[in-house]
Amino acid sequence: MGKQRRTMISFTLFLTLTMMSSLINGDTDSIQLNDDVLGLIVFKSDLNDPFSHLESWTEDDNTPCSWSYVKCNPKTSRVIELSLDGLALTGKINRGIQKLQRLKVLSLSNNNFTGNINALSNNNHLQKLDLSHNNLSGQIPSSLGSITSLQHLDLTGNSFSGTLSDDLFNNCSSLRYLSLSHNHLEGQIPSTLFRCSVLNSLNLSRNRFSGNPSFVSGIWRLERLRALDLSSNSLSGSIPLGILSLHNLKELQLQRNQFSGALPSDIGLCPHLNRVDLSSNHFSGELPRTLQKLKSLNHFDVSNNLLSGDFPPWIGDMTGLVHLDFSSNELTGKLPSSISNLRSLKDLNLSENKLSGEVPESLESCKELMIVQLKGNDFSGNIPDGFFDLGLQEMDFSGNGLTGSIPRGSSRLFESLIRLDLSHNSLTGSIPGEVGLFIHMRYLNLSWNHFNTRVPPEIEFLQNLTVLDLRNSALIGSVPADICESQSLQILQLDGNSLTGSIPEGIGNCSSLKLLSLSHNNLTGPIPKSLSNLQELKILKLEANKLSGEIPKELGDLQNLLLVNVSFNRLIGRLPLGDVFQSLDQSAIQGNLGICSPLLRGPCTLNVPKPLVINPNSYGNGNNMPGNRASGGSGTFHRRMFLSVSVIVAISAAILIFSGVIIITLLNASVRRRLAFVDNALESIFSGSSKSGRSLMMGKLVLLNSRTSRSSSSSQEFERNPESLLNKASRIGEGVFGTVYKAPLGEQGRNLAVKKLVPSPILQNLEDFDREVRILAKAKHPNLVSIKGYFWTPDLHLLVSEYIPNGNLQSKLHEREPSTPPLSWDVRYKIILGTAKGLAYLHHTFRPTTIHFNLKPTNILLDEKNNPKISDFGLSRLLTTQDGNTMNNNRFQNALGYVAPELECQNLRVNEKCDVYGFGVLILELVTGRRPVEYGEDSFVILSDHVRVMLEQGNVLECIDPVMEEQYSEDEVLPVLKLALVCTSQIPSNRPTMAEIVQILQVINSPVPHRIMDSF
């Protein structure tokens, strides 16, 4: 109401003052002067000025030339410039601005103006218009194109939407600077843009423009262009020849689009180029050789494309390079020695290619290098010593085949290095003690190597270290007592080594520690109480050691602890009180001597064998008289004790032999019955098959509800040699229950998916296996992968299902190739709703009720229309009785972030709500594009916690996946995020059912989603 009243007042004031100005008698100058005063007063009337910057503006003055932020022409006393940048003003740009008929410069940037800009269309003398970084909206009016004097137009960082009219550039012959970046503009770039013939800077980045921008007939004709930025749109097509016409071009930024094809060969004929960024597109082919002519180029980024061929030997000719990024392509070959000519190079990133050979020592000549990233290639040989003489800040050689030892380094490197990652190589020798001299080191990762040495105690001197990762590096000796001298350490991982001794008390000094993993070593002694000082600790992994004693009860006071694993040690006693310990999964404490709940009355039961006690005095000499025992002498005593032991052994042996005979007899009978069942089952399953006594080891392919001929060549070949079709070429995926292949076993040779099940926990009885598969095959729903049959032998269990050729959600969301466009919001919503419907069917319609237990992106397959299909449902039914307690089966608990809290507690009843939790995590992944748990250099982020905090702070929109480029409806995204947080509630009863979730999602997609979400 207040806004409407203010608008009405300003409109009335505008009309009144306009009429007054027209009635004023006097000379012309007086009338013109009053127009400027009155226009600014009307303009001010629609503004909120919290800091009173415009206090000097008053209608009592005859001229505004003395007002703050106003400039006048000294000859005419007309307002020519109004600059209100960064004054925290809010409001709208009203028609009062139209009174400033001589205005040349209007700059209102970095405020919070809202509404449209239609009032600016009649300022015919305007030369500079800067409205950047406000909250203006609506379409950009084509009438701006009628301002022929306009030279500078900056609308960056607003909320303008819609398409650009061709008329906008009909009269732009004076325009030199144009920036419309960071808006919501869409459609094609107008073909009339070429009429801006003197344009030297064009920035249309971070919008939703699509199609091909008509380079030949449009942009390539802007011959005075010096800066071109079309990045972060959805532009596509190839880049044609003709860029050489932009002789003055200095900056070319086309990154984060969908351009494809080869790079234009004449790009190297723009001699003044100093910045080229073509990253994150679909460019292919080899790098044009003309690039070597770009002597002035200092920033060159073609990362995340499909470029191939050998690494260019002419790279050394581009002597001006400061930043070079060829990462995530398919480049091959060796690094040429000419790379040493890049004496100005500071940042080199060649990661994730197929480069091979040794790291050239000639790179040592690039004395200005600060960042070198060569990870994920096939480099071999030693690390050149000279690298450790440079002033590098970051060195990442991980994921190669490097051998030899780590160079010791120099004083220059000691003072500069911040991040060192040599993980996943084959390095040997000792970790040099000089590592403690890297005074600014924050991240050190030497994991997955073959050092076979001690952890250097000098690590304690790394006072700024936040991440120390020495996993699986064949380390020996003890954990250094002062390893936690650094108060900054947040992640400490020493698991998978051969460390001995006790866990030092000093580890409790790591006050910032969030992850501590010492698992799979040979550590002994008790768990130190000092661990209770680690108030920031979230993950504690001590499994597979030889730790003894009780778990300190003080650990129950750690409020941030989320995950604990102390399995396979020698621990006894009660678990500490505290939420995380009360909900521990059995697998997290198994393999100890005796751990029990603190709520249990009486002592904990120890899991140790009872000793055999033999009392030598319990067997007498007949009359059991002490005198007779004494007269027998010591020889008689020992002989009688020996005889007593012999009698026990003989009796025990007889019992064992007798029991063995009975067991073998029973087993033979059981085997005969099972073989008879198998023969009968196979004969009944396959009509027309002969009773030939086919070997059970050969197996049979059972296709349920199929018309495929049993005599088809593919089926017969598969039965004779199933492993022949299950090879690397046909492999399409891998999960916790086995590897998935595709094989032409369906009707007319159609491909089916074949999961080779991990044998150990799977039902070993054909009768049971057949029954459970037939139950699962009855589950029919558009959002479920249908089960087609199975193949069974005692040694090989295969589950045959529908083949979905479009891959899984993991590959589309987290492992997307540069050639694959990101998932749109509409597709993501379709996946969310379809997955919900599939789970609702399993929970509420299908009988028996089926819990998935393992919902995650790898188990969501997508068909050719991106419809989701849930796979791996019901696999818990195929577990043996021993493994059938699914809630305690760590096969279903692959990663922190997916597992519902109740799955970690052996005493809680688990129901369908654990799937609801996993579904909530899946929603968060789809909306944010992030993984459930993300590890950074200094810490890790749990996605559900992060989104919940951002929602409480009112910044939840910052969580949304940026690759969607804001092409989504907030009215859908926000309720979906809130629904996800409700689904991931720690208390199962607070989560909705999947049937309710389907209804909520369907309502969210309607015009009034708040009706449902207001109840959350």
From Swiss-Prot:
The chain crosses the membrane at residues 647-667. The modification Phosphotyrosine is found at residues 841, 898. Residues 726-1013 form the Protein kinase domain. ATP binds at residues 732-740, 755. One of its GO terms (molecular function) is ATP binding. Residues 27-646 are extracellular. Residues 668-1016 are cytoplasmic. Residues 1-26 form the signal peptide. One of its GO terms (cellular component) is membrane. The keyword Plastid does not apply. It is found in: Membrane. Keywords: ATP-binding, Glycoprotein, Leucine-rich repeat, Membrane, Nucleotide-binding, Phosphoprotein, Receptor, Repeat, Signal, Transmembrane, Transmembrane helix. LRR repeats lie at residues 102-124, 125-147, 149-171, 174-196, 198-219, 224-245, 248-270, 272-295, 296-318, 320-342, 344-366, 368-390, 391-413, 416-438, 440-462, 464-486, 488-510, 512-535, 536-559, 560-582. SUPFAM superfamilies: L domain-like (SSF52058), Protein kinase-like (PK-like) (SSF56112). InterPro entries: Kinase-like_dom_sf, Leu-rich_rpt, Leu-rich_rpt_typical-subtyp, LRR_dom_sf, LRR_N_plant-typ, LRR_R13L4/SHOC2-like, Plant_LRR-RLKs, Prot_kinase_dom. PROSITE patterns: LRR, PROTEIN_KINASE_ATP, PROTEIN_KINASE_DOM. Glycans are attached at residues 112, 135, 171, 203, 349, 445, 464, 509, 522, 565. It is a single-pass type I membrane protein. Belongs to the protein kinase superfamily. Ser/Thr protein kinase family. The protein kinase domain is predicted to be catalytically inactive. Lacks the conserved Asp active site at position 854, which is replaced by an Asn residue. This is Probably inactive leucine-rich repeat receptor-like protein kinase At3g28040. It comes from Arabidopsis thaliana.
